[in-house]
Amino acid sequence: MNYFIGDLHLFNRNQTGEGVNYDGRPFATVAEMNQYILEHWNAKITNGDTVYILGDMAMRGRNEALIALVAQLKGQKILFRGNHDDLSDYRYQKLFADITDYREISESFDGQSYKLCLMHYPILMWNGQHRGSILLYAHTHNTVEETFFQKCVKELNENKKLSVQQGKPIR
């Protein structure tokens, strides 16, 4: 089975009470957050599952504790590079079945098949968006940027205009 997750920010104190806690997560410490993620991940995911991680797995990839923690996470892990992912440590890279920036897959939900476009960053136009494909992304959290992005996507989907009107070159 396929699963999707993003913006875990393992070992990021600014996602807990030890720092700014940007997302308002209910964790006093990094250790508490990491343990919660590990336990809930492994309670749901089996080694036969594939997990698409839509970026920002952690703040750094050269941390021994990070490598040990990610090694404990079940399933085949596919990482989409996020702005906080440091992939300079080969040992960390080897924990993932693949590391990429973008991928399109087909996935079935409730008996219907959909094209999913997967990446870390939101984009305003993606392959098949007007034919039912779904963009799955992370990065924006619950921010004003996310609200603005959703407003723009809604506007684009309501106004399906071509960039070159009526097939004529424009200037």
Predicted regions and their residues:
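Core catalytic region of metal-dependent phosphoesterases/phosphodiesterases
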Residues: 3-6, 10-104
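Conserved beta-sheet core of the metallophosphoesterase superfamily
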Residues: 94-171
